UniProtKB/Swiss-Prot annotation:
Protein name, UniProt field: Streptolysin O
Transmembrane regions: 260-273, 280-289, 358-367, 375-387
Alphabetic keyword roster: Cytolysis, Hemolysis, Host cell membrane, Host membrane, Lipid-binding, Membrane, Secreted, Signal, Toxin, Transmembrane, Transmembrane beta strand, Virulence
UniProt GO BP: killing of cells of another organism
Record remark: domains: Mature protein (about residues 103 to 571) has 3 discontinuous domains; D1 (residues 103-124, 161-249, 300-345 and 421-444), D2 (residues 125-160 and 445-461), D3 (residues 250-299 and 346-420) followed by C-terminal D4 (residues 462-571).
Oligomer and partners: Homooligomeric pore complex of 35 to 50 subunits; when inserted in the host membrane.
């Protein structure tokens, strides 16, 4: 409160000083005026009463006003007049700004980008999963089944140059866009470099357009480039599509699914897309409960390319400095990239899924995808009859086949064939792009390195041995087999088994059934007959050491002592 009063007091004092200065000037002026009046009135009679000088009256009034102001609580407000900048200074500032905007940093940009020191493979290396511990084998008993789940550590190395486009990155992956070669790029989440640009020429490869297929975009932003591409496409539809058919350009890849990082590297696609659209159950796959194959069909309608620069600075406005690029992330660890082309069309993802434990699943799925008639192959037909199929279409008239789930693979074939022709009703969609290093126009390929566990499951069914002795002799048998299990570390545990009547003499006719568990392996069947000959008392009729487990193993012996006969058949 005291500060406020003090401030008011000093404000009044300042005002009074100003007023005093003005009054002083007035007094001086009046004094001079009075002198002149005195000289001109010397003839005035002396008997008149003298009048008080005007200066004295003015001083009295000023003093009274000063006292009133000092005793007042009102603040005296002073409004200092704003002094404008000198015109010379303004002109100088304007000149400096203009000079700065006209500075040419082309040589600096070229020198700095050419001098960036990096390894293309290292800056775009993507290290996926590293597998340390896993159970190599596991045995699961279910009723009359024994399921062996086998896991093998494998690795995959790929360097794809065409990167799948997802909706969330379309504004960073258009033709002529600038990006950073960093971790975000390897994860399909590129960082954009936004700055003032030089005009950029782009070219669309739709047939029949000739010179009209190339246009220059003055300011190559996402919006401007997209508008230019739309205009080119509309020109083609309006003027050139009548007598021209698009060349068929279909890219097809397939892979069994074992893990997220593995399928990303194998198909060059973000696993989140597949997981979200196709609903891949990675957990069931790792347990060996399901087998899944993914196929990707890329149908390219046209490609838009951006003219590659001769020098790095060609893409920038001359006012852009290297310091500005550094502020936006450019460095040895994240050199700049240039999107050289974008493919437009549609992508069809197909998921084939089964719970079959057959080792022929992959072959059956591949045959179906390639259009092979699998009905003539009993094994393949059985697998496909117990499978489900899902197709998801990205791009084109996706509303018609957004997502199809069926048990009939012919339906999937129709999805792939339908809407494969480019038209206004079936528009193209950005599906993949390629970038180059701005320094030297080398293609930027993501170096995928990942380990994964390949999980396979084999199902075995319990069986039996049917023994039948119809020979004219005394016979003996030896039936041996192993039962396989696995401990918690995946190590194989073998238990030796034998038939209780091994080496017992059996006369004809004789028959019996020996049950075998689903985990039976290394089956050995031996049968011998007594010849009665002193030099060869026992003669082997059957001696098989690697009999395969089957639903029914029929072992038959017959004949005479000198001419015995034996056979093993399977059902």
């Amino acid at each position: 409160m005291s500060n406020k009063k003090t401030f008011k007091k000093y404000s009044r004092v300042a005002g009074l000083l100003t007023a005093a200065l003005i009054i002083g000037n007035l007094v001086t002026a009046n004094a001079e005026s009075n002198k002149q009046n005195t000289a001109s009135t010397e003839t005035t009679t002396t008997n008149e009463q003298p009048k008080p000088e005007s200066s004295e009256l003015t001083t009295e009034k000023a003093g009274q006003k000063t006292d009133d102001m000092l005793n007042s609580n009102d603040m005296i407000k002073l409004a200092p007049k704003e002094m404008p900048l000198e015109s010379a200074e303004k002109e100088e500032k304007k000149s400096e700004d203009k000079k700065k905007s006209e500075e040419d940093h082309t040589e600096e940009i070229n020198d700095k980008i050419y001098s960036l020191n990096y390894n293309e493979l290292e800056v775009l290396a993507k290290n996926g999963e590293t597998i340390e511990n896993f159970v190599p084998k596991e045995g699961v008993k279910k009723a009359d089944k024994f399921i062996v789940i086998e896991r093998k550590k494998k690795n995959i190395n790929t360097t794809p140059v065409d990167i799948s486009i997802i909706d969330s990155v379309t504004d960073r992956t258009y033709p002529a866009a600038l990006q950073l070669a960093n971790k975000g790029f390897t994860e399909n989440k590129p960082d954009a470099v936004v700055t003032k640009r030089n005009p950029q020429k782009i070219h669309i490869d739709l047939p029949g357009m000739g010179d009209k297929a190339t246009v220059e975009v003055n300011d190559p932003t996402y919006a401007n480039v997209s508008t230019a591409i739309d205009n080119l496409v509309n020109q083609w539809h309006d003027n050139y599509s009548g007598g021209n058919t698009l060349p068929a350009r279909t890219q097809y890849t397939e892979s069994m699914v074992y893990s997220k990082s593995q399928i990303e590297a194998a198909l060059n696609v973000n696993s989140k897309i597949l997981d979200g659209t196709l609903g891949i159950d990675f957990k069931s796959i790792s347990k060996g409960e399901k087998k899944v194959m993914i196929a990707a069909y890329k149908q390219i309608f046209y490609t838009v390319s951006a003219n590659l620069p001769n020098n790095p600075a060609d893409v920038f406005d001359k006012s852009v400095t290297f310091k500005e690029l550094q502020r936006k992330g450019v460095s040895n660890e994240a050199p700049p990239l240039f999107v050289s082309n974008v493919a437009y069309g549609r992508t069809v993802f197909v998921k084939l899924e089964t719970s079959s434990k057959s080792n022929d699943v992959e072959a059956a799925f591949s045959a179906a995808l390639k259009g092979t008639d699998v009905k003539t192959n009993g094994k393949y037909s059985d697998i496909l009859e117990n499978s489900s199929f899902t197709a998801v279409v990205l791009g084109g008239d996706a509303a018609e086949h957004n997502k199809v789930v069926t048990k009939d693979f012919d339906v999937i074939r129709n999805v792939i064939k339908d809407n494969a022709t480019f038209s206004r009703k079936n528009p193209a969609y950005p599906i993949s792009y390629t970038s180059v290093f701005l320094k030297n126009n080398k293609i930027a390929g993501v170096n995928n390195r990942t380990e994964y566990v390949e999980t396979t499951s084999t199902e075995y069914t319990s069986g039996k041995i049917n023994l039948s002795h119809q020979g004219a002799y005394v016979a003996q048998y030896e039936i041996l087999w192993d039962e396989i299990n696995y401990d918690d570390k995946g190590k194989e545990v073998i238990t030796k088994r034998r038939w209780d009547n091994n080496w017992y003499s059996k006369t004809s006719p004789f028959s019996t059934v020996i049950p075998l568990g689903a985990n039976s392996r290394n089956i050995r069947i031996m049968a011998r007959e007594c010849t009665g000959l002193a030099w060869e008392w026992w003669r082997k009729v059957i001696d098989e050491r690697d009999v395969k487990l089957s639903k029914e193993i029929n072992v038959n012996i017959s004949g005479s002592t000198l001419s015995p006969y034996g056979s093993i058949t399977y059902k």
